[in-house]
C-alpha cells in the first residue's frame, strides 16, 4: 500500500509543495526593530507561544531600525507565502503597507487607517512605573521620550508617568530624544544624561 511504502522509504513530505497547493504556510512573520531589546524579546516570546498553540510557526525578522531592511523583509514575506504579518516597525511610507496583499496587524503604531492596530495600555503603564519610582523614594527622575507623532500613543505613557511623579513631589525632567539609538548605545547615553541633568 501507499502508506506501507511511505514507512519503508522513510518518506518526508515536501512542505513547500504542500503549502503551494493549499495556499497556506502556517507561518506568521513578526517584524521588529531589535529582538534583543527586553520589550521586544518578551513580546516575541508570548506571540510565539500563542501562535504555536494554534499550529502556526513564527518567522522573526529584525530590521535594526533601517528602512531598506524592513522593505527587504516585507518583500521576502510576500514571495515566501507567509499567512500574515505582525508589524512592530514602521519605517516605510503608508502606501507600501497598504499595497501588501497579506493580512497585517500593526503593533502600537497606526501605519494606515485600514490596517488594524493593537495598542498597549499606555496610561496604566505610566501609572505603574511612576508608583514604583515613588515607592522606592527616588528623588530625581529623567523621563526620556522619542519624537512622537499622532500615530503613536506611547506619549501617553510618558505624560501620565511625568504628571504622577510631579504631583507626588518627585523631580522629573522630561527629555525628548531626537535621534534613534540602538539598544547597545542606550546605557552609555543614559549615563551622560544623568550626569548632565540629575547631578545638579
What are these regions (language model features)?
Residues 1-24:
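N-terminal helix-turn-helix DNA-binding module of bacterial transcription factors
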Residues 20-36, 139-148:
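Short beta-strand segments enriched in small/hydrophobic residues
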Residues 32-52:
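N-terminal winged-helix
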Residues 49-94:
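Central regulatory/effector-binding core of bacterial HTH transcription factors
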Residues 51-62, 142, 158, 162-187:
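Short beta-strand elements in bilobed, periplasmic/extracellular small-molecule ligand-binding domains
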Residues 67-81, 185-200:
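Short, well-structured alpha-helical segments in soluble
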Residues 88-131, 148:
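Flexible loop/hinge segments that line or gate small-molecule binding clefts
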Residues 118-143, 156-159, 184-194:
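Hydrophobic alpha-helical segments within soluble ligand-binding/sensing domains
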Amino acid at each position: 500500500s501507499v502508506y506501507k511504502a511511505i514507512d519503508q522509504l522513510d518518506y518526508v513530505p515536501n512542505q513547500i509543495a504542500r503549502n503551494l497547493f493549499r495556499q497556506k504556510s502556517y507561518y506568521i512573520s513578526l517584524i521588529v526593530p531589535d529582538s534583543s531589546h527586553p520589550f521586544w524579546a518578551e513580546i516575541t516570546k508570548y506571540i510565539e507561544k500563542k501562535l504555536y498553540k494554534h499550529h502556526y510557526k513564527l518567522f522573526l525578522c529584525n530590521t535594526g531600525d533601517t528602512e531598506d531592511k524592513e522593505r527587504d523583509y516585507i518583500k521576502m514575506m510576500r514571495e515566501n507565502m507567509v499567512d500574515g504579518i505582525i508589524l512592530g516597525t514602521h519605517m516605510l511610507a503608508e502606501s507600501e503597507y497598504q499595497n501588501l496583499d497579506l493580512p497585517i496587524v500593526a503593533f502600537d503604531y497606526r501605519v494606515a487607517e485600514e490596517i488594524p492596530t493593537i495598542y498597549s495600555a499606555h496610561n496604566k503603564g505610566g501609572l505603574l512605573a511612576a508608583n514604583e519610582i515613588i515607592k522606592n523614594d527616588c528623588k530625581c527622575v529623567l523621563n526620556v521620550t522619542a519624537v512622537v507623532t499622532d500615530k503613536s500613543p506611547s506619549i501617553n505613557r510618558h505624560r501620565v508617568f511625568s504628571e504622577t511623579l510631579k504631583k507626588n513631589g518627585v523631580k522629573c525632567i522630561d527629555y525628548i530624544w531626537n535621534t534613534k539609538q540602538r539598544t547597545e548605545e542606550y546605557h552609555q547615553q543614559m549615563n551622560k544624561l544623568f550626569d548632565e541633568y540629575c547631578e545638579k
